[in-house]
């Protein structure tokens, strides 16, 4: 989901904990996990880490990630990344894109409505979180700037995602 929204995210269940911690430290990434053990290890190393609830769904997960990181929960197809290899997609036609690295094709199909619905629900959940914790919501410009910075080569905001 983070890649769909244009964020540079590493995802793999193949990495052992030490490798995830090393990548997060060397590349200034945020670890997102349901694994309490790696969460504890990351805190001991003073790394940025978000512990997701083991029973939450994608809507609540996205809202919580946005709450903790201030990212923008929206999809701009000009920034969308390949869900397989993380490369920024290239437009090849109206509502069609291709990954320049792995050559996977993407298009706006019926699944697009589901993506939009989940993003809308996640933003609604984010507002509830912010109201619950009495935090004033960042402007859309601030959140969008974070995503745009993620797509530039300077000072990028990176996310290391590990689902357990």
Please tell me what each predicted stretch does.
Residues 1-74:
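Long, charged N-terminal interaction/targeting segments
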Residues 9, 114-118, 162-164:
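Accessory, non-ATPase domains that flank or precede helicase/AAA+ motor cores in DNA-metabolism machines
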Residues 1-5, 110-119, 126-130:
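Extended interfacial segments that mediate partner engagement and assembly in macromolecular machines
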Residues 124-126, 130-133, 152, 163:
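NTP-binding/hydrolysis catalytic cores, primarily Walker-type P-loop NTPases
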Residues 134, 140-141, 148-155, 160:
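Intrinsic-disorder-associated, low-complexity terminal segments enriched in Asp/Asn/His/Tyr and depleted
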């Amino acid at each position: 989901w983070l890649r769909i929204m244009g964020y540079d995210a590493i995802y793999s269940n193949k990495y052992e904990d030490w490798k995830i911690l090393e990548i997060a430290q060397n590349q200034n990434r945020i670890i997102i996990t349901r694994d309490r053990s790696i969460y504890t290890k990351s805190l001991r190393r003073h790394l940025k880490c978000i512990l997701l609830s083991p029973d939450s769904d994608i809507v609540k997960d996205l809202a919580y990630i946005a709450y903790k990181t201030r990212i923008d929960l929206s999809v701009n197809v000009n920034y969308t990344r390949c869900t397989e290899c993380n490369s920024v997609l290239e437009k090849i036609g109206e509502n069609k894109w291709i990954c320049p690295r792995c050559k996977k094709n993407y298009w706006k199909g019926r699944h697009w409505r589901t993506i939009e619905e989940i993003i809308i629900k996640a933003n609604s959940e984010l507002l509830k979180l912010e109201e619950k914790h009495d935090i004033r919501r960042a402007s859309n410009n601030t959140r969008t700037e974070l995503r745009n910075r993620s797509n530039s080569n300077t000072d990028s905001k990176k996310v290391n995602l590990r689902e357990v």
